Amino acid sequence: LRIYQAGALLKPCYLYLVFGNSLSESFLRYQNIAFVVVGSGDLSCFSESCRILHIKGTLSFSEVFNQIQQTFDRYSDWDSKLQLALGSIDPLNEMLEASLDIFHNPVFAHDTNFYILSSPRHVTGMSEWVHDQRTGRLIAPLSLIQDFKLDAEYQRTLITHGANIYSEELRGYRILYMNLWVSGNYQGRLCVDELQTEIQPGHFSALEYLGSFIELCIRRHNLFQ
């Protein structure tokens, strides 16, 4: 961690602390630099390549450093749980369970046929999964599957890579999603329903990080077969 000083050469290996009231368009020149912004400020002053941790409110230095340390601890603990889950007999459920406190929203995964592969938390407003009589597995309701097949926006989402947003037009709430690809083939989708808290910009990177572990599991364990 370093205190930001105007005019100093910034390095990607450091996290720079800056106060929101000192932000200006001059910050646009920085690329691939990580900042902690304390207090209110115009975050559009940063390039999209920069990583931003925004701490709102008026805090003392000790409070700021404590919040930064707590954030690092939370993500370090999450990473450790994802790593451990790689060797588990039930990696997908363990990974999604560990991710609930990162997204603060329900997280689930489904395959190409809308079979539910993992859904560790169900909250009010979510779709009610049903048991497929043929396979005995949980699956999205047939009516919802038909709605998706007829929805032009949903059809466009089937070719995307990385984390993206599916709008609230059909479901009544936004869904942060990431398609899962292995060897160029679509394997399913990882979803975060925006039902409990607002999706934050950092959740996009977090979902891609989680997705990379799940794609690795697919290769190792044939999870979606």
Stretch-by-stretch model annotation:
Residues L1-Q225:
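Hydrophobic, helix-rich cores of sensory/ligand-binding and other regulatory modules
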